[in-house]
Amino acid sequence: MDANASRVDPKLLELLVCPLTKGRLRYDAEAHELVSEKARLAYPIRDGVPIMLVSEARKIED
């Protein structure tokens, strides 16, 4: 995967929130995901586009 394709614009990251909790998201560059600590969900980034659907999110395990 091209490293540039998985980057998230910092300005976009400031605007995006978890659709479930409306809380802030943390960008995990290694996993190419946006993480909602509150909801314990990780939203994938595909071709540089954050997929902000709860049904597409990965549940974060302890």
Swiss-Prot record:
It holds the Pfam family Trm112p. InterPro entries: Trm112-like (IPR005651). It comes from the Bacteria. SUPFAM superfamilies: Trm112p-like. GO terms for cellular component: cytosol. Belongs to the UPF0434 family. This is UPF0434 protein NGR_c31900. It comes from Sinorhizobium fredii (strain NBRC 101917 / NGR234).
